[in-house]
Amino acid sequence: MYNFKEVEKKWQDYWEKNKTFKTDGYDFSKPKFYALDMFPYPSGVGLHAGHPEGYTATDVVCRMKRMQGFNVLHPMGYDSFGLPAEQYAIQTGNHPAIFTNENIKTFGKQLRSLGFSYDWDREISTSDPKYYKWTQWIFKRLFEDGYAKYIDMPVNWCEELGTVLSNDEVIDGKSERGGFPVVRKNMKQWVIDIPKYAEKLLEGLDELDWPESTKEIQRNWIGKSTGVEVKFDIKDGGEFKIYTTCIETIYGITFMVLAPENPLVDELKTRIKNWDEVVKYREETAKKSDIDRTELNKDKNGVVLEGIYAINPVNNKEVPVYLGDFVLASYGTGAVMAVPSHDQRDFEYAVKYNIPMIQVIEGRDTKESAFEKQDYLGKECKLINSEEFTGLTVEEAKKAITKKLVDEGKGEEKTNYRLREWIFARQRYWGEPVPIIHLEDGRSIAISDEDLPLVLPTLDDYQGKNGKAPLENDPDWVNVEVDGVKGRRETSTMPGSAGSSWYFLRYIDPHNDECFADPELLKHWMPVDLYVGGPEHAVGHLLYSRMWNEYLYDKGLVPVKEPFKKLVHQGMILGSNGLKMGKRFPKYCINPSDIIRDFGADTLRLYEMFMGPLDADKPWNDDAVVGAKKFIDRVYRLYTEDNKISDKENKNLDKIYNQTVKKVTNDYESLNINTAISQMMIFINAVQKEDVFPREYAEGFIKLLNPLCPHVTEELWKVLGHNNTIAYEKWPTYDDSKIVDETYEMVVQVNSKVRGKINVSTDTSDEEMKKLAKEIDNVKTFMEGKEVVKEIVVPKKLVNIVVK
């Protein structure tokens, strides 16, 4: 009977005592492999069922890579600063520092109980002054180079949390943490000028082995566009600018829209006849988040600025000016031209307020809906009602109208980005202090490097009141003097995203007090070869960390532009009811510690990897957990009770063994771990039908299973007569000559007519078959100059390529 509790504790103690997985960072003799998990926030509830999924996947690859002769860096730490810890502390009456340190101990214990092969000597936490010394050091460089700025700007303010939130922390007008209402207000705020890196961040995406969906999310968030910035005069004095990518529609303008918070509105106050109505509308708008305001499906609303008219620069026609909450002062120029015949949002606004419409591009009627650019671009549509430009195609008109505006000094070509500044301060306690002093003479200066880290003071009262930051409660810490000039320390703290924006660099040299990491080590270990974590970080952490790394690269402080070479997202582990685990359905929540207690860590690891593809969402199944445990028990009995292991050969197992080594190796490499497990189960079934299990194959199989089930395989390695750990044994190899697959001929058709034949084996994938088919010269001839509409594979019969 396999006693998993005894065996798992035994080997965890062994690994800890012998520092089995300690990485010699300076061993450059071996090829390197740096695998990274998105480090957890150490919450009070400990690990949840989703944590082991991604962590096990990276551990599987790391254990294989060690056996393949790689020097593996596989660290772990804690994203321990930020709102979650502080909110929990307030709710429970604990101090966030005490609470966080206790949770880190709990997390560390739970992670060790899962048998992960982390180098625990590299453990970090973002709330450790030895760590955030370097977070502050990097911020200081950003400040000195003009990327960290202290500016007045509209921000997302959450009264309940008492702090500013970044756009990615606001969901449907509420805070991501706690679901509290968020409003817009103007505040003096620290920001990182990430838009300056917009083009570099876009270019870098092309070279990354990341999910295409994540790259596309970042491209859309950055939002690059090319267009024209046009100056509009205001009747009786004044002007403003708009930016448009549809300059061809400028003759169709029937009104203009300003952002409610646009400063121009205040300048026009004395000329606006319905000022009280304007004030009321602006107050209502301030209660909405940017996301709420720009939601396409929302009801369009606004207010006209009575007495204010803009003059269209191409025909000098006067058009009314409105306020509309869908226009943001922080995006573009804070003003837009409205062409209701060719923009659906403008169309709905015009219908609501009975504003005239002018169609300026032919193609279809615009009485029921707008004829938008996605409908007319590239279709040789021509302009109408556009004076001298009438009759030109859209593409011709774009160039001609732009030239006219530029020549007359009324416009200029411009590239814009949707990406906004990264708000880099929170009016909260539990975060890195910002190493800046505001002096009475108006200067803001960074403290010296010798004074880093600027340690977060211990406060009994760590709750801010009336919008004031908690650090205001410690006047002895706040009030300072520099060269005889009085000043005040910055009392906002950095956001939770600060420490996570560079932690992958610190793991490489975590105890260095002279620099954030030895340049020689950075050159060897960067970039991260495999990064596993959730897709929800696409426009937060994954964008911010790329920007910080790019900045450090430009400074010559890191050797690579991009930090994460390959990114994989694990799917969500759902409750057995098929829904997300959480407070709403407590009986469907799974605690990993319970599974480890009842079935063992190896069972949990094996089960979570066998649930399905790593990137898919998967419902929990208690019966399948039992099934995983039974498989481990079967393997244990095979090695300890069945007396089949022998130095004799068994030709019957040659093919299945070599197939298994090949498939498991390839599947681990590609993170198709569930299919690797299926193959190992097939192999064990085959072995149990035989009387002889050759020792070479028995040892090879244990090595294959080790990355998934490290405890039982260490024990069985010992049963096989070895006294050393299996962790650094040589990975099994396979003999292709013993993998004799059935081959067969398949017909290749183009538009259902035979154009060639290919020979394939039983393990040739559909994609490989399509590729082979398209490499046939005769097939190429019939495909030339045509678009592939569909590719059909009928197993063991044919490949049909449909073209037009």
List PLM regions with ranges.
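Conserved oxyanion/phosphate-binding beta-strand-loop segments in alpha/beta enzyme cores
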Residues: 1-36, 66-75, 98-108, 210, ...
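Alpha-helical recognition segments enriched in aromatics with Gly/Pro capping
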Residues: 308-314, 318-331, 360, 472-616
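Helix-rich, typically C-terminal accessory recognition domains appended to large enzymatic cores
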Residues: 79, 144-158, 332, 413-442, ...
